[in-house]
């Protein structure tokens, strides 16, 4: 009987030729009021099936952490990168997202020839890309990248919680919860808040 997870590997099976490396790419942190955007790129070995792999947003934190270790140990190559709050402000979130995706890809060895990317917007990667709508749920390489990006960014925001405990970053990871907005009204923004994201508060 075929593993149910194998459905996520259709792109990998179709594209695999044993000689052309390709990666899945995804990001975490486009929407939060605070913190960087993080991207990851992952090249999985041909034939690998990772039980339980799915879009990081559909997984518990405990499951993401377990998958993070499996992906890092199993991947042929992976890259993880950030774009800072300052870069988000200077480039807008779309530009900053592609910046960090390109940084993640550039960190990989062997270098991928093309990428599988979630979404359907214009490709602004430095390599050719195949766009996959809902790719983080449908494509194993993209799902693996989504896990690495999400876990890495969440851990960063946990560290920021120790520096700025009044905002509760460990709980909401910078997203606009009621408690986060209440803390902003009481304490004002921290150095890691995104000014353009806070304009609607005024």
PLM region spans:
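RNase H-like, Mg2+-dependent phosphodiesterase core
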Residues: 1-202
């Amino acid at each position: 009987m075929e593993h149910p997870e194998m459905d996520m590997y259709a792109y990998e099976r179709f594209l695999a030729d044993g000689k052309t490396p390709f990666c899945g790419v995804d990001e975490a942190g486009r929407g939060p009021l605070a913190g960087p955007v993080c991207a990851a790129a992952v090249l999985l070995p041909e034939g690998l099936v990772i039980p339980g792999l799915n879009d990081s947003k559909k997984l518990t934190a405990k499951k993401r952490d377990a998958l993070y270790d499996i992906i890092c140990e199993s991947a042929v190559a992976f890259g993880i990168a950030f774009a800072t709050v300052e870069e988000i402000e200077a480039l807008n979130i779309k530009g900053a997202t592609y910046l960090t995706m390109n940084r993640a890809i550039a960190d990989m060895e062997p270098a991928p020839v093309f990428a599988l990317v979630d979404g359907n917007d214009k490709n602004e990667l430095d390599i050719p890309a195949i766009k996959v709508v809902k790719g983080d749920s449908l494509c194993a390489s993209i799902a693996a990248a989504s896990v690495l990006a999400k876990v890495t960014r969440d851990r960063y925001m946990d560290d920021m919680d120790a520096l700025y405990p009044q905002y509760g970053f460990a709980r909401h990871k910078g997203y606009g919860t009621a408690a986060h907005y209440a803390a902003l009204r009481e304490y004002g923004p921290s150095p890691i808040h995104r000014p353009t994201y806070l304009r609607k508060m005024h």
